[in-house]
């Protein structure tokens, strides 16, 4: 019930966070748990709201993902968030260098 109250932006971020923490797309998780037909249906529905359940997370190539990673790491540093080892760790200083070069 709680997930039904997400805004479009919150839903997009949740899809990215699921991939960040598991290394598996939301589409593949739904496919494993509910089957391919349901995963296809859910992804088709998500596309009406400008979302894609196959979206991954890569702060090296996507500026939005970089901002999300920055917020997460600051939240952990400042003890607002509990640390949970992600599927893949990112060095925030290296990410900043990458994005400074791209600007």
Enumerate the predicted regions with their spans:
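Long, amphipathic alpha-helical surface segments
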Residues: 27-94
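Sec-dependent signal peptide cleavage junction
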Residues: 91-103
């Amino acid at each position: 019930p709680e997930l039904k109250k997400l805004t479009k932006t919150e839903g997009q971020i949740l899809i990215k966070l699921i991939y960040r923490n598991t290394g598996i797309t939301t589409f593949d998780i739904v496919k494993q748990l509910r089957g391919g037909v349901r995963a296809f249906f859910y992804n088709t529905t998500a596309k009406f709201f400008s979302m894609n359940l196959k979206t991954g997370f890569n702060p090296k190539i996507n500026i939005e993902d970089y901002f999300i990673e920055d917020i997460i790491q600051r939240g952990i540093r400042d003890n607002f968030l509990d640390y949970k080892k992600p599927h893949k760790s990112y060095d925030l200083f290296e990410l900043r260098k990458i994005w400074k070069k791209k600007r």
